[in-house]
């Protein structure tokens, strides 16, 4: 699932940069509740605008964010 891959990637990047989700929110100019709702499995998908803001907070591009094997191997999600 795409959302799971997005959440896993942000968690990985936070671990690499040694920051917590609260710090990611602060750096990105989004509320902590936005970040925590993203990792909540019962919540809706995260928007590309939010992903862009979080990437900016991490100092990476969208291309760098999505350039992983996890995203390359995702199955189509046509409903």
Describe the function of each predicted region:
Residues 1-23:
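A short, Lys/Arg-rich alpha-helix, primarily the initiator
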Residues 13, 27, 38, 68:
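Residues in the recognition helix of alpha-helical DNA-binding motifs
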Residues 15, 26, 56:
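Alpha-helical residues within the helix-turn-helix
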Residues 29-45:
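Recognition helix of helix-turn-helix/homeodomain-like DNA-binding domains
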Residues 37, 66-79:
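Short, charged recognition helix plus adjacent turn
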Residues 42-56:
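Short, basic-rich loop-to-helix N-cap that marks the start of a DNA-contacting helix
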């Amino acid at each position: 699932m795409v959302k799971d891959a997005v959440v896993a990637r942000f968690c990985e990047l936070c671990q690499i940069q040694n920051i917590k989700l609260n710090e990611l929110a602060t750096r990105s100019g989004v509320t902590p509740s936005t970040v925590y709702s993203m990792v909540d499995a019962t919540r809706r998908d995260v928007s590309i605008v939010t992903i862009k803001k979080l990437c900016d907070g991490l100092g990476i591009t969208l291309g760098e964010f999505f350039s992983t094997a996890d995203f390359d191997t995702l199955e189509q999600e046509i409903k």
